Amino acid sequence: MPCVLPQRITPKLCKIIKKYHPVYVNTHFNHPWECTPEAEKACAMLADAGCPVGNQAVLMKGVNDNPDVMLDLHRKLLKMRVRPYYIYQADLTKGTNHFRTPVSVGLEIMDKLRGHTSGLAIPYYVIDAPGGGGKIPILPQYVLGRNGNDIILRNYKYNIYTYPDVENSTQQENVVEQPYMRKRTNGRKAASPKVVPRELVPAEK
């Protein structure tokens, strides 16, 4: 409503909202051009009424499938006191296939948001799984593997770092189990652990 019908956010409505806290509002700003003065005023009124405001954008081909556009959008939202919450991968809805982008595009956007703006401006990138699977977060891979007791990490610049993990007698050298590679199936692993590429392991000094 603050995006497409900001005039509906009135002092009377905000007075009602104040009576029934907690009330949360999620908006649907998809492009920085939608962050108009009218929309900003509406969001400010909600925030002043004690209503936390979030945003759920949808990744759409030709609209916002660009890291610079998404960065601009989320910076403007923060200035409007709106917390970026989700970037949705476009749903499998009839008649909207021309808006869908590869998941790799969304991952690239998330990778380029990190390190270039406040963490408050970085939403979750999610797929609303078909068949009632719910919202599943899709993340760039920052944990590359393990070398003995060291976790091999990369940052947003793709620089490689090691972090000494807490010792665990069950860990295996050169192996790290990625969270997305496991599921609970009567205690059995669903997939093999990921082995650290040798070229990514920093040389010992």
List where the protein language model places each region.
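Auxiliary Fe-S-binding modules of radical SAM enzymes
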Residues: L78-K205
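Conserved AdoMet/S-adenosylmethionine-binding subsite of the radical SAM
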Residues: M1-T117
